Amino acid sequence: MCFAGDPQIATTKLDESKSKAAPETEKVKPTYISLVKFTEKGIQNAKQTTQRLDAWAAKVQSMGVTIKQMYWTLGEYDQVCIFEAPDDETAASVLLAANMLGNIRSQTMRAFTAPEMEKILAKIP
């Protein structure tokens, strides 16, 4: 999801601020981790990958999605993207839109923080 975008869109810099604990009144958005592979089209357009990321980050920000970190990797996957979205539906919609552009294919997992995991564990009968 995090790397697709139209290279013609004006680019902006990613939010590189360090993660800080949210005030208790602020709702913490769910975190997602996407494992990304370039398609043949994505490989052909590899020189624009960072520009596409900046454009995509700006585009999805209006939907409440924040790309926290993007790593270009060696091995089975070409990228790992860590992002936050307001809910699963929003995450799914931006992932579908990114994949539809044809540069990438992704697998995405919902990630849980330690406090979220504590809440999950507390519900075990």
Model regions: which residues?
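An amphipathic, aromatic/His-enriched active-site/gating alpha helix that lines ligand/cofactor pockets
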Residues: 85-115
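Short, well-ordered beta-strand segments in beta-rich or mixed alpha/beta enzyme
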Residues: 32-37, 71-94
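Short S/T/G/P-rich N-terminal loop/turn motif that feeds into the first structured element of a domain
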Residues: 4-62, 66, 74-77, 112-125
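A short, amphipathic edge element
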Residues: 64-68, 103-106
